[in-house]
Amino acid sequence: MSYVKVEKASSFELTISDIAPDKSISHRSAMFSLLSDEPSQIENFLRAEDTLNTLEIVKALGAQVEESDEKILIKPPKQIQEPKDVLDCGNSGTGMRLFCGLLAGINGFFVLTGDKYLRERPMARVAKPLRSIGAKIDGRDNGNKAPLALRGNTDLEPFDYESPIASAQVKSALILAALRAKGECSISEPELSRDHTERMLQGMGANIDTHWSHGRYRVDVVPLTKPLEPLKIRIPADPSSAFFFAVAAAIAPRSKVVLENITLNPTRIEAFKVLQKMGADVVFLEKENKYEPIGDIIVTHNSLHGVEVSENIPWLIDELPALAIAMAVADGRSIVRNAKELRVKESDRITCVVENLKKCGIQAQEFEDGYEIIGGELHSAAIDSCGDHRIAMSFLIAGLVSGMEVRDIECIKTSFPNFLDLLSQIVKVERGD
């Protein structure tokens, strides 16, 4: 099993212009190219395991993909083809859930699978509403776990679905299915989750309206009557990936980082605002706004204090493990609630965060929907990543104040292939098998 050791770091100042491209937008760019009848041009596509798996699935569905160093050109098929083999989503819940929605209205038979971690994640939250409108989806655990076998239906019923949870993946899957339904459809959620799907599809010409109604965020979708316009997009840097280095600057004394060309979508920068609330100096500089607002984020070290986080959880669900590291060195108590979704991510992130913090000498306890962390002095420890890229990267960042060894780090490649290269610019990194 591979491992990485990092030594305690001194202060640093760093400008990072090559944060990994945004994973959410990369997935969607590849998928949504299938909704046009003209080639889509994608610059700065994330070349990580998860998104490359999505690109391979797009090829298997009939698209031609031309790749160069700077851009990807995707030529969609005249109609999506039934693949000859199983579609492998790797570690990506986004890939599996969104492809279920995309393929629900396509005539054909499709089998979606993934790695051992993805095959244990719940899929009924997408499969059940799709079944209710006419798609045939089955799988392990009564259709709740992959591999999933899907037979599309070109006669999907119109629907009005009230999601019990705020989930960008559930919402996006249903929006994609709605584009091929027989009539207008609506999806609502109790809070606004990430809205890349709505923004990008509207930018491609889809008739999608978003608004608040009776305390719920609502998306109204008119089915397609013609192919959408092709994408011409340069994918910004991923704020979820950038946030690891924001935490690094916040916890390392006399440190500062400039994170360039990040998407500043309000549903993606909530964790930075929490870090700001904890006492870190955080500045947002917007530079452009087409499909998404894009700009720079500057984070400078300052003394941190505890914080309670219970609102807008869907906006920072992926950043909570890294935020837990800031909480661990902050003065006082921090509490995270309403984050039960952490238990069904790539790992049970509530248990993994709490148990690993305890190894580092930090007082922490689990709740069913979150945890409590008492800030203190981090100690060096041997950490198990739980096969989860965000756990691995979070505790490597923790090593900046104490030194740390993190085991099973291959998972980092699923989202942030150059993470260790960037980390080595601010701290000594030792890799081993």
UniProtKB/Swiss-Prot annotation:
It is found in: Cytoplasm. Phosphoenolpyruvate binds at K23, G93, R121, Q169, R349, R390. InterPro entries: Enolpyruvate_Tfrase_dom, Enolpyruvate_Tfrase_sf, EPSP_synthase, EPSP_synthase_CS, RNA3'P_cycl/enolpyr_Trfase_a/b. It catalyses: 3-phosphoshikimate + phosphoenolpyruvate = 5-O-(1-carboxyvinyl)-3-phosphoshikimate + phosphate. Its EC number is 2.5.1.19. It is an enzyme of class 2 (transferase). Pathway: Metabolic intermediate biosynthesis; chorismate biosynthesis; chorismate from D-erythrose 4-phosphate and phosphoenolpyruvate: step 6/7. Monomer. Belongs to the EPSP synthase family. This is 3-phosphoshikimate 1-carboxyvinyltransferase.
